[in-house]
Structure formats: structure tokens, C-alpha cells
Amino acid sequence: MNTAIEFKNIKKVYGNKVVLERFNFSVAKGEFVTIIGSSGCGKTTVLKMINGLIEPTSDDIFVDGSNILDKNLTELRPNIGYAIQGSVLFPHMTVEQNISYVQNLINKKNKEKTKLAVSKWMKLVGLDEELKERYPAELSGGQQQRVGIARALAASPEILLMDEPFGAVDEITRGQLQIELKQIHKKTGITVLFVTHDISEALKLGTKVLVMGKGQVQQYAKPDDLLRNPNTDFVKQLVDKERRTCYLPDERLEDCEYSGAGNK
């Protein structure tokens, strides 16, 4: 396996609270891993560690074979995109300026390259070109979320971290964003880690699903394997909940087509 990310026996403590303990898992390059678990189980902590925002209390995390503790943030961050719920955009910047912010840091002297990159990512996330000069306050929730995703992708990172990025939008927009994200993953081959509270979303999007609980990995498997063979009571509860709803296999998402996403 060509490994993109590896956690080795990680422990993380906040004050007197142990959030992660004996936490082990690895992600292959190009994998789309959805992460699910109860509130406070350490899902966001995992993403923040990969991005260098916080450090483990003990042991090591490897990104592309290198221990992140041996890297400074300027080395680590260009390879990692980060999108969160609500997509915190710069209110005084236009859509184009928001998306190009990271590109401008990398390509300070190549404005034409930056403009081409902005157009490329706007198109890929379903944003109309005419929105370039608008400010965040003039956009719908779905459009703002797309800008946030485009900004996270603008530097062409190898890894995309997403922390409940669709939590603040309506169900129709959420479904459209799910389809777009699957298409982006398919086109770019980027490694994605996607945190969600929704088991249905985790099963639809992920090529693999990481179930967290009590600071440890409860199960790490392909969606179909998770449904067929839940191995703990916690995972069984999640699976039973999903069986009471309608499970949409991720193949359906890849084949779906729709239009007008950039206008919603």
C-alpha cells in the first residue's frame, strides 16, 4: 500500500481528559475516508493533528512517509487543504480573491497562473464564473460552501481534510455537494478525510469508513463490509440506524448528474 497518512499508537490528552489512546490507522494515497463517531470522540482532533494545528501527546504521525513533528508548518500546509462547516470566508474579499488567497502566497509573481487556477476550481466545484466578483454576503449557503472547498483545493494539495463541511446547508444542496465532491475525488485522485455525524453520508461518500469511539478505532472498513459485519455494539447501533433508512451505495453518487448547482 502506498501510504498517505499513518497514525502510530497515538495518544492525545487535553488537561485530564484522554481523547485518543492507542490510536492506530493508515490511509492509502487516493483513498476517500469518512470518519464517524459520537461527539467528543476525537474526530476533529485527528484532522487538526494531520494539519499541524495540534501535536499528539505521544508517538508519531506520518504524512507521505515523513513524521509531521519533524516538519515546520510552511513545509506541511501547502500539501494539505482544509475545509470546515460554514466555510469561514474573508468577508472583505470577493469570491476570486478568497479562492486565490493561497495561490497568491505560492505564485506571488504569476498572476495569470493564479487566475487560471481560480477558474479551474470554480468550474470543478460548480460555481458560475459570474460569481467571481461577488462578496460572501451576496452568496447562498451552498455557494459559500463551494467557495470554501475551492479555496481548500486551490493549491492542488495532496490531502484534503473536511470537517463536517456540509452541515450548514439544506438537504438538496447537501446532496449536490456530495455528488460534486465524489466527482472531484474521481478526477483528481486526491486523498480525502471527511468527518461527519451522519452514517448515511459516511457510507455514501467513503471508499472506507473509520468508526471512532472511546478514543480508539472501533472499526475501519469498506462501506459494504461495515454494513455486513459490524464488529462492536457501537458500530451495530450505527448500522441498525442506517438500515432503517435508505442506504445509497456510492456508485449511485458517481453516476448521478444534475445541472444548475452553482446557482443554489
Give residue ranges: language-model regions.
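Short helical segment in ABC ATPase nucleotide-binding domains corresponding to the A-loop/adjacent helical element
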Residues: V95-L105, E112-K115, S119
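Conserved ABC ATPase "signature" region
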Residues: E112-E130, Q183
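Conserved ABC ATPase "signature" C-loop
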Residues: K214-G215
